[in-house]
From Swiss-Prot:
Homodimer. Interacts with host TRIM25 (via coiled coil); this interaction specifically inhibits TRIM25 multimerization and TRIM25-mediated RIGI CARD ubiquitination. Interacts with human EIF2AK2/PKR, CPSF4, IVNS1ABP and PABPN1. A motif (Nuclear export signal) lies at residues 137-146. The dsRNA-binding region is required for suppression of RNA silencing. The gene is NS. This is Non-structural protein 1. Its main location: host cell. It is found in: Host nucleus; Host cytoplasm. It comes from the Viruses. Inhibits post-transcriptional processing of cellular pre-mRNA, by binding and inhibiting two cellular proteins that are required for the 3'-end processing of cellular pre-mRNAs: the 30 kDa cleavage and polyadenylation specificity factor/CPSF4 and the poly(A)-binding protein 2/PABPN1. In turn, unprocessed 3' end pre-mRNAs accumulate in the host nucleus and are no longer exported to the cytoplasm. Cellular protein synthesis is thereby shut off very early after virus infection. Belongs to the influenza A viruses NS1 family. One of its GO terms (molecular function) is protein serine/threonine kinase inhibitor activity. Upon interferon induction, ISGylated via host HERC5; this results in the impairment of NS1 interaction with RNA targets due to its inability to form homodimers and to interact with host EIF2AK2/PKR. The keyword Chloroplast does not apply.
Length: 219
């Protein structure tokens, strides 16, 4: 077994433990917690594949990290951190739009991977806009926080949200879920628009199939 593979796993185990302690103090935001859940599942799989005990690997990983920190100057650490690409958090929705309760007359729910898709099948002949809050890294969607479908009157008629009990999602997972939501809403003769932010980072095929972009005044 390659020694780099083992030491990488050990360091990942220790760093996950540090992040878990941070989350236990209720300091992590939604993208942070989502990555924590995804990485936990990944570490369990890697541990099983490598035949390594996670608790033991965590202790060894701590020793490796402590040794690196002893050798590294504060200035070097700052430079290393600054050179790593950081994710950006993009918002189509206000806090009020994200936290608002909504109800469905004819509810429909579908689970696609680790994403839950909900929509009101009673909505007909409406112009609907999809808005989302999510993080982006390397110009691609990293983590979806919440996506909601709004009528022109401001009513919420659909939603895509991550399932807390399951591991994280990919850009393709989100794209697939958006397609399901759009298809369900269009079935009742609704016209569905996708926000420019979503088009850019998560629904690139919108230009290919002729779906019109969100007019600037509705952005």
């Amino acid at each position: 077994m390659d020694s780099n593979t083992v030491s990488s796993f050990q360091v990942d185990c220790f760093l996950w433990n540090v992040r878990k302690r941070f989350a236990d103090q209720e300091l992590g935001d939604a993208p942070f917690l989502d990555r924590l859940r995804r990485d936990q599942k990944s570490l369990r799989g890697r541990g099983s594949t490598l035949g390594l005990d996670i608790e033991t690997a965590t202790r060894v990983g701590k020793q490796i990290v402590e040794r690196i920190l002893e050798e590294e100057s504060d200035e070097a650490l700052k430079m290393n951190i600054a050179s790593v690409p950081a994710s950006r958090y993009l918002t189509d929705m206000t806090l009020e739009e994200m936290s608002r309760d909504w109800f469905m007359l004819m509810p429909k729910q579908k689970v696609a991977g680790s994403l839950c898709i909900r929509m009101d099948q009673a909505i007909m002949d409406k112009t609907i806009t999809l808005k989302a809050n999510f993080s982006v890294i390397f110009e691609r969607l990293e983590t979806l926080i919440l996506l909601r479908a709004f009528t022109e009157e401001g009513s919420i008629v659909g939603e895509i949200s991550p399932l807390p009990s399951l591991s994280g999602h990919t850009n393709e997972d989100v794209k697939n879920a958006i397609g399901i939501l759009i298809g369900g809403l269009e079935w009742n003769d609704n016209t569905v628009r996708v926000s420019e932010t979503l088009q850019r980072f998560a629904w690139r095929s919108s230009n290919e199939d002729g779906r019109p972009p969100l007019p600037p005044k509705q952005k």
